[in-house]
Amino acid sequence: MTIIRKSHPLMKMVNHAFIDLPAPSNISSWWNFGSLLGLCLIIQIASGLFLAMHYTADTASAFSSVAHICRDVNYGWLIRYIHANGASLFFICLYLHIGRGIYYGSYMYKETWNVGIILLFLTMATAFMGYVLPWGQMSFWGATVITNLLSAIPYVGTGLVEWIWGGFSVDKATLTRFFAFHFILPFIIAATAMVHLLFLHETGSNNPLGIPSDSDKIPFHPYYTIKDLLGVFIILASFLTFVLFFPDLLGDPDNYSPANPLNTPPHIKPEWYFLFAYAILRSIPNKLGGVIALVLSILVLAFFPLLHTANQRSMMFRPISQLLFWTLVSDLFILTWIGGQPVEPPFIIIGQVASILYFSIILVLLPVAGLIENKILKW
């Protein structure tokens, strides 16, 4: 087996990526989320494939086809809830993975980090289009509101929105193309994830200390395969418990009503994992300004490598940066809460303050903290 593993062209690639890969000896469980994201993607593609076999991408029958999956298809309800809650699991792992990258300075691997940002955008696009497919009230109005934001783009906005819609409103053409894109994008995500891994394996993994670990490397297998498997079992057990006991906890009750263009839901809001960005969008009274802030709320991640001023890579020994990091995490929780609230006082001002704080911490306070810490440590 050893001979094949090191000589066969295909096996050699797998060997270099997952078996004989030299890995730092001190990476913690925060490094498990890469493999868990791979697991999430596999779960989503597999469950999505089975759903697509029974789903009908037509405005007249989309809602009914989802009901048919839940009622008449063998274990259809389970596949549907695994897929719906799998998206939430995906984003939980994604946000923890990004948080780890920020805390330990993994963003200094610029190519890996930038491909990761592209992956985040692709995943968000996929999740948004998937939410439209059941053709419930929140599906329809969410699609209308979010696609309509593009009309804020000067000169080409209106034409662009109608081009995406395939008509003058969200209708059959929109649903059909969203299904097509929702089906193809996960495979594009899988290919991009391979590029992400390719760039990562050029440099090797970072570690909690943020120092070079070339002098102390261990093989990925069996050490980290076993460690990843532990994470997989914990996540799968938690996930299945959630799916089987609280399948609708994260969903919107409005989405159990068929789409009705004549009846607007009282509070239009996206799924929980987009609420922080939605809160930032709503905190700016101007439409174009809101759209720019929405895009920047994710694109701001690209500024981390450019604004790294500290002489240490990791935040492990930088208390001021640690304080700011956890303030940022708290701020994101506040933004998520505000995104789900109606647009009325005191939520408006809380959202605006939280949005300003979000950009201030990333663009101003963290770089300044890095410089202060350099001075304190006489680096």
From Swiss-Prot:
Instruction: State the needed cofactors, names only.
Output: heme b
- Gene3D superfamilies, per this entry? Cytochrome Bc1 Complex, Chain C (1.20.810.10)
Q: Return any one Pfam family short name.
A: Cytochrom_B_C
Where does the chain bind heme b b562?
A: H83, H182
The record lists the membrane-crossing segments as 33-53, 77-98, 113-133, 178-198, 226-246, 288-308, 320-340, 347-367
Q: Name one GO molecular function term.
A: ubiquinol-cytochrome-c reductase activity
* Record: residues binding heme b b566: H97, H196
Give compartment(s): Mitochondrion inner membrane
Q: What does the further note read?
A: Heme 1 (or BL or b562) is low-potential and absorbs at about 562 nm, and heme 2 (or BH or b566) is high-potential and absorbs at about 566 nm.
Q: Which family does it belong to?
A: Belongs to the cytochrome b family.
What does the UniProt record say this protein does? Component of the ubiquinol-cytochrome c reductase complex (complex III or cytochrome b-c1 complex) that is part of the mitochondrial respiratory chain. The b-c1 complex mediates electron transfer from ubiquinol to cytochrome c. Contributes to the generation of a proton gradient across the mitochondrial membrane that is then used for ATP synthesis.
Q: What name does this protein carry?
A: Cytochrome b
Q: Which organism is it from?
A: Chaetodipus spinatus
The gene name reads MT-CYB
